[in-house]
């Protein structure tokens, strides 16, 4: 596929947050609570959670941008977690809380991502498990209620999974946290969605207390706009849109940690529509992003640094190694491809504009966010660039290419 540059302008709506959708669908399924959910992106990760719900006996019907979950939970014999780290980790906590005996089938990529700290924490409550290549065998039949102890520094998803485990066990459940939670806003997102279904999550001095029962009353929700995906639209506007881009559907008080992008870049809110933000091409000041807190913002903001004299500072870049790809290495590879200057101290990665005449003919990243970053960089370079593996963008933002085309980029499939 070739993406050609252009002066982008216009309005788009942010895709629905996959973090919101996966949590809502899985909680609905495991609690047997009817759900209507709007603003669904139906990205690949969303579809994993939908298929898990179906394997658990729920009926899931879909329309253009919404879905309906109905039915009663049944213990599945097996489920497929695809490449979705969120669904994988959350469902481990949910299945353990339901005392299920189940096989979780994994992709090769997902099988290599961290899970053992969560399994070790749940094993203290009676979970037994075995990993055979691409299958995780879980036996929750011996699960007992009690405290869960989890390290928050590895992944916020481990903490969210522990909270969901306690909600399924019922009664009062305690989750004790050691070390600071990375991307802790996602735990708040889990807690707030869970509370809509009945259970309350209260933060304590050293963790969380989960109380209350599921009320099982039919629920109607709408997924927030996805700030992680919107980071690419903001970068495109700041680099390539003299007339400006407006993005709709972004909740200003979202629990998504990546809503912090609003404080990292120059953007303006729409007084008439509080969920809309505008960006336009301008000279940029230096941008800083902490990869420990906002790893998904590092790729789009790195692109801003690549075409800015002030540059972009990425703190704790080592946290980018544990994502779907080694984003630490990939971001540097992308920057070099466009002639950008790089300073890497290990604790801090600094990228800024370099040889403006350099650009690649072909980019071949394999991870969805790096592919999107490469596409925005190509447009900003002013040159047509070929991109492979673009089908992987559907993991998080299926309408990305059509949105860019609507804004004025040239998109041609070869």
Task: Mark where each language-model region is.
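Short, structured segments at the rim of ligand-binding sites
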Residues: 1-414
């Amino acid at each position: 596929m070739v993406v050609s540059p252009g002066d982008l302008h216009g309005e788009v709506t942010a895709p629905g947050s996959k973090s919101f959708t996966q949590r809502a669908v899985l909680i609905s399924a495991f609690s047997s609570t009817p759900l209507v959910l709007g603003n669904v992106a139906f990205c690949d990760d969303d579809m994993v959670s939908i298929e898990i719900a179906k394997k658990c006996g729920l009926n899931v019907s879909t329309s253009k941008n919404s879905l309906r979950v109905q039915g009663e939970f049944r213990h599945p014999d097996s489920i497929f977690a695809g490449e979705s780290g969120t669904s994988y980790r959350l469902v481990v906590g949910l299945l353990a809380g339901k005392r299920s005996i189940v096989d979780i089938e994994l992709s090769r990529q997902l099988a290599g991502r961290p899970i053992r700290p969560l399994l070790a924490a749940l094993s203290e409550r009676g979970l037994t498990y075995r990993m055979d290549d691409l299958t995780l065998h879980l036996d929750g039949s011996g699960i007992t209620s009690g405290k869960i102890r989890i390290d928050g520094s590895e992944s916020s998803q481990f903490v969210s999974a522990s909270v969901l485990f306690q909600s399924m066990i019922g009664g009062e459940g305690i989750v004790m946290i050691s070390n600071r939670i990375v991307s802790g806003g996602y735990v708040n997102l889990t807690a707030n969605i869970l509370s809509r279904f009945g259970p309350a999550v209260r933060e304590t001095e050293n963790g969380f207390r989960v109380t209350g029962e599921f009320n099982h009353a039919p629920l109607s929700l709408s997924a927030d706009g996805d700030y992680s995906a919107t980071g690419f639209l903001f970068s495109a506007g700041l680099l390539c849109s003299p007339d400006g881009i407006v993005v709709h559907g972004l909740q200003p008080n979202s629990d998504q940690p990546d809503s912090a992008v609003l404080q990292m870049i120059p953007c303006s809110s729409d007084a008439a529509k509080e969920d809309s933000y505008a960006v336009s091409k301008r000279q940029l000041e230096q941008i800083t992003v902490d990869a420990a807190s906002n790893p998904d913002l590092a790729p789009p903001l790195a692109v801003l640094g690549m075409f800015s004299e002030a540059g972009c500072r990425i703190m704790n870049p080592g946290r980018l190694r544990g994502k779907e790809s080694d984003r630490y290495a990939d971001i540097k590879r992308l920057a070099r491809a466009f002639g950008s200057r790089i300073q890497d101290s290990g604790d801090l990665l600094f990228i800024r504009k370099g040889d403006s005449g350099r650009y690649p003919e072909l980019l071949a990243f394999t991870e969805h966010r790096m592919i999107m970053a490469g596409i925005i960089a190509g447009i900003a370079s002013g040159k047509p660039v070929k991109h492979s593996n673009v089908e992987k963008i559907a993991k998080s933002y299926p309408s990305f290419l059509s949105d860019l085309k609507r804004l004025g980029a040239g998109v041609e499939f070869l």
